[in-house]
Amino acid sequence: MSKPLCSTGLRWLWLVVVVLIIDLGSKYLILQNFALGDTVGLFPSLNLHYARNYGAAFSFLADSGGWQRWFFAGIAIGICVILLVMMYRSKATQKLNNIAYALIIGGALGNLFDRLWHGFVVDMIDFYVGDWHFATFNLADTAICIGAALIVLEGFLPKPTAKEQA
């Protein structure tokens, strides 16, 4: 017997759509208004800077000849499938986990779209202190990191008792 989708964690899939719209919209604006390498200061220690990332986080494997595009696309698809199954198996009331999974899926799909459509991931957020610059990243990366942090946080929270779960 199948359970109603609204009673599962899939009820939180709307958050995936929100992350995708914000991420892809921000990347579209960068592509339309910036040339590669352009930088605009927003605040002290924060710039918009158009960069292309052919690898993964911190440009890992960026100069590997192209195979990494498909490797990272496969990883993103696999992670999305696993998290969707986990959302389906969880209750809609397990908010923290489901929000975390939705943020990770939305971020992974945003970067997957870039890899498949452009052949690279559009990055634009440049955080710096003095002359030191953190790796340029995008809103999809931010969603993935927030989702991962929520999963870690959930591990430290007290588990509900059997009575509370009923």
Curated annotation (Swiss-Prot):
Name the gene.
Answer: lspA
List the molecular function annotations (GO) for this entry.
Answer: aspartic-type endopeptidase activity
Purpose of the protein = This protein specifically catalyzes the removal of signal peptides from prolipoproteins.
Task: Quote the HAMAP family the UniProt record gives.
Answer: LspA
Where is this gene product found?
A: Cell inner membrane
Family of the protein in this entry: Belongs to the peptidase A8 family.
Report which reactions are catalysed by this protein. Release of signal peptides from bacterial membrane prolipoproteins. Hydrolyzes -Xaa-Yaa-Zaa-|-(S,diacylglyceryl)Cys-, in which Xaa is hydrophobic (preferably Leu), and Yaa (Ala or Ser) and Zaa (Gly or Ala) have small, neutral side chains
What the entry lists under PANTHER family is as follows:
LIPOPROTEIN SIGNAL PEPTIDASE
EC main class here is hydrolase
Pathway the protein takes part in: Protein modification; lipoprotein biosynthesis (signal peptide cleavage)
Topology in the lipid bilayer is annotated as: Multi-pass membrane protein
Q: Which residues cross the membrane?
A: 12-32, 70-90, 102-122, 137-157
The organism is Salmonella paratyphi A (strain AKU_12601)
Q: Which GO terms describe its cellular component?
A: plasma membrane
* Keyword Hydrolase applies: yes
The UniProt keyword set, sorted, is: Aspartyl protease, Cell inner membrane, Cell membrane, Hydrolase, Membrane, Protease, Transmembrane, Transmembrane helix
Name of the molecule in the record: Lipoprotein signal peptidase
* Enzyme active site: D123, D141
Q: What's a GO biological-process term for it?
A: proteolysis
